[in-house]
UniProtKB/Swiss-Prot annotation:
It catalyses: Endohydrolysis of alpha-D-GalA-(1->2)-alpha-L-Rha glycosidic bond in the rhamnogalacturonan I backbone with initial inversion of anomeric configuration releasing oligosaccharides with beta-D-GalA at the reducing end. It holds the Pfam family Glyco_hydro_28. The gene is rhgB. One of its GO terms (biological process) is cell wall organization. This is Probable rhamnogalacturonase B. Gene3D superfamilies: Single-stranded right-handed beta-helix, Pectin lyase-like (2.160.20.10). Keywords: Carbohydrate metabolism, Cell wall biogenesis/degradation, Disulfide bond, Glycoprotein, Glycosidase, Hydrolase, Polysaccharide degradation, Secreted, Signal. The active site is at D219, H294. Its EC number is 3.2.1.171. Glycans are attached at N145, N239, N321.
Length: 521
């Protein structure tokens, strides 16, 4: 009998069984970045790039990609780079992009600064965990212009990972994952302006694992759009953000098998929202588990008549088999915006909605409410029964706090936002994203430091000749013999690539960091 890897791990108690409904197979690149670098390394400095914050990085990056697109590593060393023309890096296979420098937007065109498309076996990362794209969006926003370029977009990319990267102050969206498959996104910090339309991560794809991210903005934190299937989102820190969501949903919505787990939301618009206004299609098999919130306007907000979007033709999007489990914390004002709002279409009521172990309380006043409309299931204001007919809004008001609502806070909760008219500083990637949860993978910078210390111990007992050879390897480029790129404690001298990743550390790791979920073993 063949067993599925994820099923076996669930039986062993290593991962929660509900997650098996989220990921359908392996995620991540098929070959390691070290193998790619050993095949060929294309340093943008060799193609005309200069770390002078003036010379346009666009053409050198495109040229380096052209040389390595069939297998290799494109390397942007540490330093400050200007980018005034955007790049579309298409039809690559078995390649990686290592960004150890900071890319500053200097152009004003729309579109996407970096677009990766029609690509397989791909990895985008910073070996120092400090590589960044600085969009300088405030230069647009100060004049009320919200239609500038997006920072990063992946389209039709399979078997990939993006990690240890920082995205800052996009003029528009920060990171879009469009019609991709088998991907892993982790260990990132995204910091945007305090305004709508500056989304953190938007994903409409299949079999994607997004984990260990911090997002600061005032729109989407990590949001699933349609169509999407088999998405697992966990260990997310929405730190003064818009909050996580699904939508906006319109005609022919097709979303299923989605799990959000370990989501911490601070001083944001909502902890989780499903938003639509008319439309058609379905959202099914969804789990929202282990949510902690403090100071948010809304907590659970399912709104099928969301007034911030124009009405779409159709009876509404059908929601079914939605589980909301283990929510704790406080909302800003429960009398104004209660912690449970489930407003479903009258013509296609929601059904099989389960709310359990839900304890939230107001930070202002001594009352809060729960509100439901045309919604069926179990818990709070939901109606029971198998005959799903429409019903008007029902609201229950309570004046005593539920037991067990107290929840931990994060030490890095921001006290103020970054506005939208001044330069936003580049943050560091945190090492904690949810209270008590350890990230699945250490930052590349931490792995580098550990490796450097190990080398120091090794060299202390080597002969002088051996130590000399070790030093040459550390400072040299990947060898033509297929040797992996060396690990280091930071940027490697002479513009050579630093350490290359081997993927995260979730149980059942497949070859070359390609995480294995659900496939037969």
């Amino acid at each position: 009998m063949r067993l599925h890897a994820f099923t076996l791990l669930s039986l062993l108690g290593l991962v929660p069984s509900f997650a098996a409904a989220s990921l359908s197979g392996s995620v991540g690149p098929l070959t390691s970045a070290s193998a790619k670098a050993a095949k060929k390394t294309c340093n943008v400095l060799d193609y005309g790039a200069k770390a002078d914050k003036k010379t346009d990085l666009g053409p050198p990056l495109a040229a380096a990609f052209a040389a390595c697109k069939s297998g290799g590593l494109v390397y942007i060393p540490a330093g400050d780079y200007a980018m005034s023309t955007w790049v579309k890096l298409a039809n690559g296979k078995a390649w990686a992009l290592q960004i150890d420098g900071v890319i500053y937007r200097t152009g004003t065109d729309g579109g996407n600064m970096i677009m990766i498309e029609h690509t397989s076996d791909f990895e985008l990362y910073s070996s120092t965990s400090s590589g960044a794209m600085q969009g300088l969006g405030y230069e647009f926003h100060a004049s009320n212009n919200w239609s500038g370029p997006r920072l990063l977009r992946l389209w039709d990319v399979s078997d990939f990972s993006v990690h240890d990267l920082i995205l800052v102050d996009s003029p528009s969206f920060h990171f879009s994952i469009d019609t991709c498959s088998n991907g892993e996104v982790y260990n990132m910090a995204i910091r945007g302006g305090n305004h709508g339309g500056l989304d953190g991560v938007d994903v409409w794809s299949t079999n994607i694992w997004i984990h260990d991210l911090e997002v600061t903005n005032k729109d989407e934190c990590v949001t699933v759009k349609s169509p999407a299937k088999n998405i697992l989102v966990e260990n997310i820190y929405c730190n003064l953000s818009g909050g996580c969501a699904m939508g906006s949903l319109g005609a022919d919505t097709d979303i299923s098998d989605i799990t959000y787990k370990n989501i911490y939301t601070w001083n944001s618009n909502q902890m989780m929202m499903i938003k639509s206004n008319g439309g058609s299609g379905t959202v099914s098999n969804v789990v929202f588990e282990n949510f902690i919130g403090h100071g948010n306007a809304y907590s659970l907000d399912i709104d099928s008549f969301w007034s911030s979007m124009s009405a779409v033709s159709g009876d509404g999007v059908t929601l079914n088999n939605i589980t909301i489990k283990n929510w704790k914390g406080t909302e800003a004002n429960g009398a104004q915006r209660g912690p449970i709002k489930i407003i479903c279409p009258d013509k296609v009521p929601c059904y099989n909605i389960l709310i359990e172990d839900f304890a939230m309380w107001t930070e202002t006043g001594s009352k809060q409410w729960y509100s439901c409309q045309s919604a069926y299931g179990s818990g709070f204001c939901l109606k029971s029964g198998s005959h799903h007919t429409s019903y008007a809004v029902t609201t229950t008001t309570v004046s005593s706090a539920p037991s067990g609502y107290s929840a931990a806070k994060m030490a890095s909760d921001l006290s103020t936002d970054f506005g939208s008219t001044k330069s936003i500083p580049i943050p560091t990637i945190p090492t904690s994203f949810y209270p008590g949860a350890t990230p699945y993978s250490a930052l590349m910078s931490k792995q580098s430091t550990k490796a450097a210390k190990a080398r120091a111990v090794d060299m202390s007992v080597e002969t002088p000749a051996a130590a000399s050879r070790s030093e040459q390897v550390v400072q040299g480029a990947p060898q033509e013999t297929g040797q992996s790129a060396p690990e280091s404690a930071g940027p490697v001298p002479s513009g050579n690539p630093g350490p290359v990743p081997t993927g995260g550390s979730r149980p059942s790791r497949h070859r070359h960091g390609h995480h294995h979920f659900g496939s037969a073993i």
